[in-house]
UniProtKB/Swiss-Prot annotation:
Gene: argG
Gene3D superfamilies per record: Argininosuccinate synthetase, chain A, domain 2, HUPs, Single helix bin
Designated name of the protein: Argininosuccinate synthase
Binding residue positions for ATP: 9-17, 116
Keyword Nucleotide-binding: yes
Organism: Listeria welshimeri serovar 6b (strain ATCC 35897 / DSM 20650 / CCUG 15529 / CIP 8149 / NCTC 11857 / SLCC 5334 / V8)
Pathway named in the protein's UniProt entry: Amino-acid biosynthesis; L-arginine biosynthesis; L-arginine from L-ornithine and carbamoyl phosphate: step 2/3
Pfam families: Arginosuc_syn_C, Arginosuc_synth
């Protein structure tokens, strides 16, 4: 009898390695699928490990460029910070992983997809909603959520089935990383009063250890897309990874955040996102230079909403599609170069230029070259203040009598 095929989102870690064996024992033929979205995974090692622990097939996909161009770029152009602080690191990669899982499932004729999320986090929602949006007919299984084992029980199961237990299993932190940044939780970080230890960080240095000399970078954008760093053209993925190194060594992009999770609890998260913070700041400055006032004032409303829909696992929803369409329509004239100083945890914009700049120095100056017609201000003020003046005149005639 042919076994039912299931595609597992495989990381190479303990949870998903145990999940392979558990699914095999449950009667499935397991096909492992692992993506590299910029965290520097050893895909060859992970591919072999999946087969070793029981998968019949193992897919490894280098998805860095697709992640950068189709997902991180949207977050950049949306200046996406969930609750004003979190630049959607993990939330951005989940829809791409779900998309690839569905593609492999279709290719292999699988009837189900499995993931390694617990029942306590946001990722279970993101994966399952995305999978159902792309393939409503596929079943979704969550072994880790279903078996409800303790960590000790999971380790014992692994040892009984000769599943390699990672040497860093005693790492107190739960870490997720992609090219847009690194997230860290658990361990001592669960106490919101505790100062995060330096061991919690990897992409950034402390302010005390940051250089005493700044780095100056120039980032050039074409239609809102970063295309070069310091005059060197490079792919978006490489630009982000390069900027992570440069900004990270200056301690840029450390975020300590109490976060309202989708599942209803608060969590304490520590993030590192040096490139994301730097690029968002630079992009915002270029928009300030090239946007008309009305678009500049309205776009933050869209930014807040798209941050929420992405965080809440609704990437493949009609609302997100509509929000992204608006976003892209605003980027046509976001062209130019931004100069940023990176120093002691700060990304400071020091210069900006654009062929589409709406800044007119002759209108802004207070020198003799001023071309602004100040006489026009009199009529403008009369019309602009007319509703306020009429309201004051009407209401000043109303006598309010208060009985004591």
């Amino acid at each position: 009898m042919t076994k039912e095929k299931i595609v597992l989102a495989y990381s190479g870690g303990l949870d998903t390695s145990v999940a392979i064996q558990w699914l095999v024992e449950s009667g499935y033929e397991v096909i492992a699928c692992c993506l590299d979205v910029g965290e520097g995974k050893n895909l060859d090692f992970i591919k072999e490990k999946a087969i070793t622990v029981g998968a019949s097939e193992s897919y490894t996909i280098d998805a860095k460029e697709e992640f950068a161009e189709d997902f991180a770029l949207i977050a950049l152009q949306a200046h996406a910070y969930y609750e004003g602080k979190y630049p959607l690191i993990s939330a951005l990669s989940r829809p791409l992983i779900a998309k690839k899982l569905v593609e492999v499932a279709r290719q292999e004729g699988a009837s189900a997809i499995a993931h390694g999320c617990t029942g306590k986090g946001n990722d279970q929602v993101r994966f399952e909603v995305a999978i159902h949006a792309l393939a409503p007919d596929l079943k979704v299984i969550s072994p880790v959520r279903d078996w409800k084992w303790s960590r000790e029980e999971e380790i014992n199961y692994a040892k009984e089935h000769n599943i390699p237990v990672p040497i860093d299993l005693d790492n107190p932190f739960s870490i997720d990383q992609n090219l847009w940044g690194r997230s860290n939780e658990c361990g001592v970080l669960e106490n919101p009063w505790t100062t995060p230890p330096e061991a919690a960080y990897d992409l950034t240095v402390s302010l005390e250890d940051a250089p005493d000399t700044a780095d100056i970078v120039e980032i050039t954008f074409d239609a809102g897309i970063p295309i070069s760093l310091n005059g060197e053209n490079m792919s978006l993925a490489n630009l982000i990874l390069t900027l992570n190194e440069i900004a990270g060594k200056h301690g840029v992009g450390r975020i300590d955040h109490i976060e309202n999770r989708l599942v209803g609890i608060k969590s304490r998260e520590v993030y590192e996102c040096p490139a994301a913070v730097t690029l968002i700041k630079a992009h915002k400055e270029l928009e300030d230079l090239t946007f008309v006032r009305e678009v500049a004032h309205f776009k933050p409303i869209i930014e807040q909403k798209i941050s929420e829909t992405i965080y809440n696992g609704l990437w493949f929803s009609p609302l997100t599609e509509a929000l992204v369409a608006f976003l892209k329509s605003t980027q046509k004239f976001v062209n130019g170069t931004i100069r940023v100083k990176l120093f002691k945890g700060h990304a400071i914009v020091e210069g900006r230029k654009s062929p589409n700049s709406l800044y007119d120095e002759n209108l802004a100056t207070y020198t003799s070259s001023d071309t602004f017609d100040q006489d026009a201000a009199v009529g403008f003020i009369k019309l602009w203040g007319l509703p306020t003046k009429v309201s004051a005149e009407v209401n000043s005639k109303v006598t309010i009598t208060t009985e004591v």
